[in-house]
């Protein structure tokens, strides 16, 4: 076991400031090569308008080496929000915001892929293109609802030529088609306009999946700016076509920017099975309200008051910095659905690129969706837990297994025998007590990222830092750290989980922050802290404490683009000895993800 901690004491290389995570940076608003004013509505003649220059170029090393092997992304071009995932007649459907024209934001349509296992995907022609007055500016994010009788319906936001937003509806053209390739927009679109007093017509988007209220009428929520508040506005309908606004929002707040991509669903404490919103909700269930705001996905746990027709959070926090997060990294615009095949709730998020705009143009692609995760409510009813769907384990091969390891201060244990660029690692850390833990400062909850940056892996602590060093070059000038620090708060532990990218690459022009989040640890109930990290070339997803904190990171080490090799280690740099009862790792095979699209781009 090597004593090789000198690498962590090196000056931070290319430390970037904590760049603001604007949803659409300024570079994506410029002209697009091959852009058009409209798109064909015929699924048999969809035009991609791809730049001939991009098509004729030999793929660059960055295009191939940084492209993921088992994450969802189209063969090329721009992708952002997941929209309307569902399971229907034997297939999972993943719709997504997609630019047919290139790897920059614009000309958005609804991409469409299908799968039988959530791992391997068949790419189809776009389900929705911008070809009507109410969506000529773009077919923006929305949801799918399964109506009584098994009729799926898409409700989505469209923008008109003046960029005013409204909600539109489409039905499958042929329900007997197992892929549901073609969708027909209703003639009276848009079905919902922002006509009520106090509404902003350019901040009215992203309708949720519908649910049925106690009166038998449909409900749905739409993200909006309303009388200066951020709100999930509530609407009712008897037929899912004609909607009226309820005189109060589902929930609103006066301290954040507009809420995008709201999600609302029922959960049972301690039950990792999902609940179908179209069925009766069992007694004791709670509800989760998620909103995408300021480049992160935040949520609250509470109850859906049927009499008031409103969401009531269990804990009201005026400071939104204290709201819980779905993911503490590069993760946004998540969307969940009830998986009737396996009786679970599954969630996806969009992970944007954090390299430069010129890198995206060189690669010819930008963005991906995270690994689908099962999401449920923990036993105490306070927070959501997430874990990669079991199906992803079908890609595992070449397992290595270590048991009974002991990591002393300064120890590095190299994990050999797997592809370090495509790996799944599960490791348990065992703590005997909190005796060596440093005191916890509650103010750290306001900015865990800053605390990860100040207390990096090179800063020795009482208990921790301990965790993984991944994607490390031979000379350690490039490496990413995923680790824990344990603090003591009264009689419980407070665990800080960090994914530190500040030394992840020698390349210039990258965003390389230190992401982080806290979770509680009760040593009387559990003696171990689990860490699972999936490495997929430029995407790293980590799950700490059984999914209490999840962090998605995008990394672009030069060693990967150069075709070099990388190393992976378990480490401890804290005063307390950390035991590792089990460490397992696998190489991950490549999935078949939209490799052969089921349609021709002319």
Curated annotation (Swiss-Prot):
Name it.
Fructan 1-exohydrolase
Under the heading Pfam families, the entry gives: Glyco_hydro_32C, Glyco_hydro_32N
The GO annotation for biological process reads: carbohydrate metabolic process
Q: What keywords were assigned to this record? A: Disulfide bond, Glycoprotein, Glycosidase, Hydrolase, Signal
| Enzyme class (EC, first level) | hydrolase
Its UniProt entry gives the catalysed reaction(s) as: Hydrolysis of terminal, non-reducing (2->1)-linked beta-D-fructofuranose residues in fructans
Checking InterPro entries in the record gives: ConA-like_dom_sf, Fructan_Metab_Enzymes, Glyco_hydro_32, Glyco_hydro_32_C, Glyco_hydro_32_N, Glyco_hydro_beta-prop_sf
Source organism of this protein record: Bromus pictus (Patagonian grass)
- Kindly list the GO molecular function terms attached to this UniProt entry: fructan beta-(2,1)-fructosidase activity
Q: Which family does it belong to?
A: Belongs to the glycosyl hydrolase 32 family.
Cystine pairings recorded for this chain: 452-498
């Amino acid at each position: 076991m090597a004593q090789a901690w000198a690498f962590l004491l090196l000056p931070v290389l290319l430390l970037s400031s904590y760049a603001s995570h604007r949803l659409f940076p300024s570079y994506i608003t410029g002209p697009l090569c091959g852009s058009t004013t409209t798109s064909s509505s015929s699924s048999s003649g969809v035009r991609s308008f791809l730049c001939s220059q991009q098509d004729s170029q030999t793929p660059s090393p960055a295009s191939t080496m940084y492209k993921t092997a088992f994450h969802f992304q189209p063969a090329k071009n721009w992708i952002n929000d997941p929209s309307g995932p569902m399971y229907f007649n034997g297939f999972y459907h993943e719709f997504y915001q997609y630019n047919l024209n290139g790897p920059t934001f614009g000309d958005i349509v609804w991409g469409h892929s299908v799968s039988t296992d959530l791992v391997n995907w068949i790419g189809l022609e776009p389900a929705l293109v911008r070809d009507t007055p109410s969506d000529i500016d773009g077919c923006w994010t929305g949801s799918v609802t399964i109506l009584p009788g098994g009729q799926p319906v898409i409700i989505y936001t469209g923008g008109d030529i003046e960029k005013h937003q409204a909600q539109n509806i489409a039905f499958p053209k042929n329900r007997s088609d197992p892929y549901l390739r073609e969708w027909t927009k209703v003639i009276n679109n848009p079905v919902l306009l922002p006509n009520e007093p106090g509404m902003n017509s350019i901040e009215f988007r992203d309708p949720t999946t519908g649910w049925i209220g106690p009166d038998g009428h449909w409900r749905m929520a739409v993200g909006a700016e309303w009388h200066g508040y951020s709100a999930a506005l509530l609407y009712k309908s008897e037929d899912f076509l004609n909607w009226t606004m309820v005189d109060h929002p589902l929930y609103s707040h006066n301290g954040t920017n507009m809420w995008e991509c709201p999600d609302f669903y029922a959960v049972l404490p301690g039950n990792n099975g999902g609940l179908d919103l179209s069925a009766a909700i069992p007694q004791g269930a709670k509800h989760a309200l998620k909103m995408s705001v300021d480049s992160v996905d935040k949520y609250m746990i509470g109850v859906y008051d049927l009499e008031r027709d409103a969401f009531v959070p269990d804990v009201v926090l005026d400071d939104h910095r204290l709201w819980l997060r779905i993911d503490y990294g590069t993760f946004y615009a998540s969307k969940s659905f009830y998986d009737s095949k396996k009786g679970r709730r599954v969630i996806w998020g969009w992970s944007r690129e954090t390299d430069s705009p010129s890198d995206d143009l060189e690669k010819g692609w930008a963005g991906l969706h995270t690994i689908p995760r099962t999401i449920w409510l923990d036993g105490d009813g306070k927070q959501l837990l997430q874990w990669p769907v079991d199906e992803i384990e079908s890609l595992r091969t070449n397992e290595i297994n270590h048991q009974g390891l002991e990591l002393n201060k300064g120890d590095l244990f190299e994990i050999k025998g797997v592809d370090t660029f495509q790996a799944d690692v599960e490791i348990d850390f065992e703590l005997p007590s909190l005796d060596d833990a440093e005191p916890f400062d509650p103010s750290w909850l306001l900015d865990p990222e800053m605390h990860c940056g100040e207390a990096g892996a090179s800063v020795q602590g009482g208990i921790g830092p301990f965790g993984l060093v991944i994607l490390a070059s031979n000379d350690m000038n490039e490496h990413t750290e995923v680790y824990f620090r344990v603090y003591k708060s009264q009689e419980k532990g407070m665990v800080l989980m960090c994914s530190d990218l500040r030394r992840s690459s020698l390349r210039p022009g990258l965003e390389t922050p230190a992401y982080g989040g806290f979770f509680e640890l009760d040593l009387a109930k559990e003696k171990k802290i689990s860490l699972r990290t999936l490495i997929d070339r430029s995407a790293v997803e980590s799950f700490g404490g059984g999914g209490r904190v999840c962090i998605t990171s995008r990394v672009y080490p030069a060693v990967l683009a150069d075709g070099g090799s990388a190393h992976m280690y378990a480490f401890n740099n804290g005063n307390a000895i950390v035991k590792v009862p089990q460490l397992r790792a696998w190489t991950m095979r490549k999935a078949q993800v939209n490799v052969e699209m089921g349609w021709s781009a002319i």
